[in-house]
């Protein structure tokens, strides 16, 4: 948020304004009214303070950075570890108690569905680079198979 509600840097008539010059005061007011504030929970300290963070007026979403959180917990990428699951539950509980949204990234459709079932209300699907890699791999495999079939059928 822009002051007096936050400490966001100011830049106007650029990409987030579609490069359209506008009245700065109305732009600030509109951004403050409609902007979404997402805070990342990526450490045990963030988990321990999730309730206090969620209680901050103006915070809309607590987003779990699952790789960073598991890494800082000393259990990298062990997303089924009981300590990791307890940390996630703690953040979900904080969001429920304070009426905030919990969010996280899911890398597969199945992961996204599980996150939604657990109570996450904001779920991002896949990393852009990973989705791009999967698409390229699939396409190249089809091309190679097609080429191999043609070579053997001549």
List each model region and its residues.
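Glycine-enriched alpha-helix->loop->beta-strand junction motifs that scaffold or abut catalytic
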Residues: 1-2, 55-61, 117-123
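Hydrophobic faces of well-ordered beta-strands that scaffold small-molecule active sites
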Residues: 37-42, 62-64, 102-105, 122-125
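Glycine-rich tight-turn/loop motif centered on a GG-T
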Residues: 2-12, 72-86, 126-128
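Conserved, mostly hydrophobic/aromatic
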Residues: 53, 65, 115
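Conserved anion-binding
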Residues: 1-57, 68-71, 152-153
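Glycine-rich phosphate-binding active-site loops on the catalytic face of alpha/beta enzymes
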Residues: 62-71, 120-139
């Amino acid at each position: 948020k822009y002051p007096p509600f936050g400490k966001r840097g100011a830049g106007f008539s650029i990409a987030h304004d579609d490069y359209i010059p506008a009245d700065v005061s109305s732009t600030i007011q509109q951004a403050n009214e409609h902007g979404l504030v997402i805070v990342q929970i990526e450490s045990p300290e963030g988990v321990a303070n999730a309730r206090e963070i969620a209680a901050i007026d103006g915070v809309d979403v607590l987003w779990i950075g699952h790789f960073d959180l598991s890494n800082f917990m000393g259990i990298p990428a062990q997303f089924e570890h009981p300590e990791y699951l307890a940390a996630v539950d703690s953040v979900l509980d904080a969001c429920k108690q304070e009426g905030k949204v919990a969010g996280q990234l899911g890398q597969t459709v199945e992961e996204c569905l599980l996150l939604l079932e657990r109570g996450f209300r904001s779920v991002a699907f896949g990393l852009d680079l990973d989705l791009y890699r999967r698409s390229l791999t699939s396409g190249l495999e089809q091309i190679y198979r097609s080429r191999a079939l043609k070579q053997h059928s001549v």
